Design a protein with these regions (language model features):
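Local beta-strand N-terminus motif with an aromatic residue
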Residues: 77-78, 114, 169
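Conserved beta-strand termini and adjacent loop/short-helix elements that scaffold enzyme active sites
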Residues: 29, 67-69, 151-153, 202-204
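Glycine-rich, N-terminal phosphate-binding loop of Rossmann-like dinucleotide-binding domains
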Residues: 83-85, 121, 176-177
Length: 220
């Protein structure tokens, strides 16, 4: 199985390393050329216990790759694209979705086969609808009909314990709205949930809300 993760910051890099450590072929995409150059040399720009060794191990095994080109990742035959780009606050405090929707548009401009577009970034409820519209708009511009799904898969790992949290999650929340997307996400997470049924499937809006609710509880 092949997947791509767009955004090689904290969430994207930890997710990519952990997925690859379980045998999935992962391509991490980032527009920052210097960051990608460093990662290709196994220089990890963040500190997280166990991450450096995990990146080195999976790069050497050719399961973890880095590129600045999302098109290159899509052309390699990935089945899912996880969006882990930033959502910085606007002046009014609302989430800036320009990076999230930029990824969606680029996917629509380049896909030729089915993919599931999975949002890992913390986003407002309803973002998946905007992502779907952005992908479809680009497909319409190209005059092509390519099937795709959208999904929400928020992360809950803690800094300093991210590897352990990801590899042995107490829950994996996934918001989907088609059986095909659900089956794909089950395949992706099967190695992480063999010991017990930790996957929680909801509709997409509920998954988006769960992340916001969890953040609000942690902030109190």
């Amino acid at each position: 199985m092949k997947i791509a993760i767009v955004g090689s910051g904290y969430v994207g890099l930890v997710s990519g390393a952990c997925f690859s450590d379980m045998g999935i072929e992962v391509t991490c995409v980032d527009v920052n050329e210097e960051k990608i150059k460093s990662l290709r040399q196994h220089k990890v720009p963040i500190y997280e216990p166990g991450l450096q060794a995990m990146v080195e191990r999976n790069c050497k095994a050719s399961r973890l790759n880095f590129t600045t080109s999302l098109k290159e990742a899509l052309d390699s035959g990935v089945e899912a694209v996880f969006s882990a780009v930033g959502t910085p606050p606007d002046e009014d405090g609302s989430a800036d979705l320009s990076y999230v929707l930029g990824v969606a548009r680029e996917i629509g401009q380049n896909i030729n086969n089915y993919v599931c577009v999975v949002t890992k970034s913390t986003v407002p409820v309803g973002t998946a609808t905007l992502v779907r519209e952005a992908v479809q708009e680009e497909l319409d511009k190209r005059g092509v009909n390519v099937e795709f799904d959208v999904a929400s898969n928020p992360e809950f790992f803690k800094e300093g314990a991210a590897i352990a949290d990801f590899m042995s999650p107490d829950r994996v929340v996934v918001g989907v709205d088609t059986p095909r997307a659900r089956k794909l996400m089950e395949r992706i997470y099967r190695p992480f949930t063999l010991s017990s049924d930790r996957m929680i499937f909801t509709d997409i809006r509920s998954a988006e809300m769960i992340k916001y609710a969890a953040n609000a509880m942690l902030a109190t």
